[in-house]
């Protein structure tokens, strides 16, 4: 993962000169606005104090849980001399964590503020490394576990009892656009403590892969 972060940062620091170049829904050589849609997969987990003590049963949610992402985005060029863009939008994303037969499902609404830099890779292909903060709110969440006494599957809410709804952190990654088609891979790590008590520190994080279109 450290090598992945280093590669993204190095790519963002590389500032090759940009000639006339257009790719799909937005042009890198002039100021304009673009819109997009995203659909993808997340591999979420919880870090820090991820154990929940309940009736002498310890559940650790640090393992990866697969979820989906749906989003609409909007982007705006920030500079007249360089292909630097600000992209935001509204994301619905499923995160959480698991450990064997125990899972924690977190459904969140998320607003990122991403800085993207456009690099011409080939004709009609743009490489777009990005980094920026995100702000998230948990709209629904539950934990699922097997009751040790009855052996039956149980569910209960996690917000207000174990976790806070508000979250924030940073995203970084890299996108690739070909004509209207867009793909990206990245990682997001929470910096806000979402544990619902002062004795624990819990952060949400996720690896994500998204596909979509830019108009």
Give residue spans per PLM region:
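Cleavable N-terminal export/targeting peptides
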Residues: 1-30
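Predominantly the C-terminal beta-signal and adjacent terminal strand-loop region
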Residues: 21, 26, 48, 85, ...
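Flexible, solvent-exposed loop segments that connect beta-strands
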Residues: 45-62, 94-107, 139-164, 193-203, ...
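Short glycine/proline- and aromatic-enriched beta-strand/turn motifs that initiate or cap beta-hairpins
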Residues: 20-66
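Residue-level signature of outer-membrane beta-barrel architecture
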Residues: 41, 74-78, 117-119, 137, ...
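Residues that define the transmembrane beta-barrel architecture of outer-membrane proteins
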Residues: 31-33, 64-68, 105-111, 125, ...
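Transmembrane beta-strands of outer-membrane beta-barrel proteins
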Residues: 33-39, 68, 84-88, 111, ...
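Short loop/turn motifs that connect adjacent beta-strands in outer-membrane beta-barrel proteins
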Residues: 21-32, 78-84, 120-126
């Amino acid at each position: 993962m450290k090598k992945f972060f280093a590669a993204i940062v190095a790519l963002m620091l590389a500032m090759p000169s940009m000639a006339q170049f257009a790719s799909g829904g937005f042009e890198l050589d002039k100021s304009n606005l673009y819109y997009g849609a995203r659909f993808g997969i997340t591999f979420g987990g919880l870090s820090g104090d991820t154990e929940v003590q309940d009736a002498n049963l310890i559940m650790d949610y640090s393992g990866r849980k697969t979820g989906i992402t749906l989003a609409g985005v909007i982007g705006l060029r920030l500079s007249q001399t360089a292909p630097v863009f600000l992209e935001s939008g509204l994301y619905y994303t499923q995160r959480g964590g698991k450990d064997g037969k125990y899972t924690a499902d977190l459904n969140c609404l998320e607003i990122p503020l991403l800085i993207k830099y456009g690099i011409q890779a080939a004709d009609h292909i743009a490489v777009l490394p990005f980094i920026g903060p995100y702000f998230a709110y948990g709209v629904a969440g539950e934990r699922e576990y097997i009751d040790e006494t009855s052996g039956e599957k149980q569910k209960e809410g996690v917000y207000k009892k174990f976790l806070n709804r508000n979250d924030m952190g940073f995203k970084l990654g890299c996108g690739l656009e070909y004509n209207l088609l867009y793909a990206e891979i990245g990682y997001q790590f929470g910096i806000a403590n979402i544990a619902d008590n002062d004795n624990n520190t819990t952060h949400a994080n996720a690896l994500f892969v998204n596909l979509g279109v830019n108009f």
